[in-house]
Amino acid sequence: KDAGNYGDKTFLKSLPGEGWSGSLAEYDDGAARTAPVASYAANRLGIFDLGGNVWQWCEDEYKASMNAPDVLKEYPVLEKEKASDGTAFRVLRGASWLNNDPLTLRSSFRNYDYPGFRSGIRGFRCVLVVSGR
């Protein structure tokens, strides 16, 4: 339960008969969808929730070169950098409660979407600066 909120046993149980499977079938973070802030252990820098829960919108325009060659081979759709209307996609990072493929769980993995697209697997990671740290 220390890694974060990803597509796991609890998620799979919430979708009976859907035919979902995945490489995280033995992992169980206890949340079927989004989890409250700080539900999982902080990293070595004391930062919570950098992986899983929801994809984090970033200001950066997406570029295919941001991903490693093995990622682009597995997900050729990530070669696309703009929408059909010419709008540049924006970067999404951190994976979500829906993801269970080890490639998409890498901190280096970049996903993308149309700016302003909304869904239950995309959002923001809020930061609180603690004085004296």
Where are these regions (language model features)?
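Functional-site microenvironments in short loops/helix caps that host divalent-cation chemistry
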Residues: 1-111, 120
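Short, structured beta-strand segments at or near domain termini in extracellular proteins/domains
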Residues: 119-133
